[in-house]
Amino acid sequence: MRIDSTTRHVRGVALFERRIGEGPPTVVLHGGPGAHHDYLLPGFDSLAPGRTLIFYDQRGGGRSPVPREVPVGWREQVEDLEALRSLWGLEQLTIAGYSWGGLLGLLYATEHPDRVARLALVSHAPVWREARAEFEARFAERNLASGLQEERKRLRGSGLRETDPEAYRRRVFELSVAAYFCDP
């Protein structure tokens, strides 16, 4: 399977991009904001046969860091995606958005409806306040009930931060999103 990585310069920021597969493109939008696309690879790369999956680390996340003074709101994220679409030479996008990426896909479709061919939402972030409050309460409950606190405590005492900072960072991130994938 073909895998390519590059950095795209759009709207004054450098965005890391990874492409997997060959065929018609599907843009995969990761959660966050402020996260990276890597955690989606084990699940989403199985969709690559017959298409090109385009992942990119959104402004301010992963391998696309920005200085503090650079805005990273939803409008900037939407316009970054529009600038990438133009740079890629695509008339319309097929988008698969996970969590915050699903909400970003919805916002993009609202702002640029003529530029979206297909939009798949995977466990997208809540759109209205009441749903967000309910989600946050359930998420906090899963965080406590699933033994994640004990796992975090073990990690803090493991010495991994000093011996392998990158592995420590990855594990901290895994534990920060683990309650999203809790088995009810």
Give residue spans per PLM region:
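Alpha/beta-hydrolase
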Residues: S146, E150-P184
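Short, glycine/charged-enriched secondary-structure capping and boundary segments
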Residues: L41-F44, R68-P71, A109-T110, A133-A137
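Catalytic nucleophile-loop/oxyanion-hole region of alpha/beta-hydrolase
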Residues: P65-V78, A125
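Conserved hydrolase catalytic core segment
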Residues: E91-F135
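Conserved acidic catalytic loop of the alpha/beta-hydrolase fold
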Residues: R75-L93
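Conserved HGGG/HGGXW glycine-rich cap/lid loop of the alpha/beta-hydrolase fold
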Residues: T7-V70, L84-S86
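Flexible "cap/lid" loop of the alpha/beta hydrolase fold
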Residues: R118-R161
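Short, hydrophobic/aromatic-rich segments at coil-to-beta transitions
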Residues: M1-T6
